[in-house]
């Protein structure tokens, strides 16, 4: 399981790990997770050729039976030797509610590797008070810190964004808050330390232990502070247009409007899939209010028609997210002559109170 808060780089890391395992001759199955439907992560991973199942409508802990069913479905279809699971970025207590139940109830089917929790280094520097910048309310940060507390391995992703001094300060802050935790710094984009990380989680089993204490009232309030939006947009133009540029400009529109409303972005990610394409997609990410929208996958050729998927998570009212996305789609589309953008599906909501299917206080070796 590769966890971490929204925008930590989980999907990129999952793709890199899946590719590495596949190159070693292993069959890989991926299971993604979201509170809503139409998940960008699923589209990204399927476009890379990985057998992928999606659990929507709740986190793994609340949809535990669906997680097991997804694993069985992948087993029937492609017989994976390794499953990689990516939980919802706003969820915690996954050891007690997911990995321990898997070990206790399905230990004959699955061996559980150490749980990695990724952190975006810039976000982490702000959370630990080392640098100034936008952050979240106290109860949202409760979830963030609980994710780190339950990690078997804390992984500082995107370490290429920090120099040695800043990385050292972050390591020291994590060690002071969570003494004894193993910490790795990696960069999926540049390939830094991926071999060491992947070798560890591919060769070791999660240690036995006791579950951490979690205040579910605070946890539920923290989740409820986050607005969630998923939508799909059908694009049709009279003349082929630059899809990568459109994605970046649309992300910029959303960013500007949310910043004006004082809403902190947790993660915005969008995919554009050309009509009649061969699996190629364009992907743009935005992980903070002051972050420059970044393309993680590009479309080399201009596009005339396609489908846009938008996943937005921010500390803001869901209705505000809906209004911002509608206005931003209209604004970005109007800048492209002859482009028609029709909202096909839009849902915005706050996550419900987490109610785990199981919660085990611990497992023995």
Description of each model-found segment:
Residues 30, 183-186, 343-345:
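A structural preference for short, hydrophobic beta-strand core positions in alpha/beta folds
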Residues 141-223:
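Canonical P-loop GTPase G-domain recognition
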Residues 26, 76-79, 103, 107, ...:
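Non-catalytic alpha-helical coupling and interface elements of nucleotide-dependent molecular machines
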Residues 1-3, 8, 12-142:
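Nucleotide-state-sensitive switch-loop elements of NTP-binding domains
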Residues 94-98, 166-170, 242, 321-325:
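Residues at alpha-helix caps and immediate loop-helix transition turns in enzyme cores, especially N-
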Residues 59-62, 189-194, 277, 349-353:
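A short acidic, often aromatic-flanked loop/helix-cap motif at beta-alpha or helix-coil junctions
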Residues 90-91, 123-125, 161-162, 240, ...:
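Short acidic, S/G/P-rich loop/turn micro-motifs used as interaction or catalytic elements
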Residues 1-3, 7-12, 203-365:
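P-loop NTP-binding site
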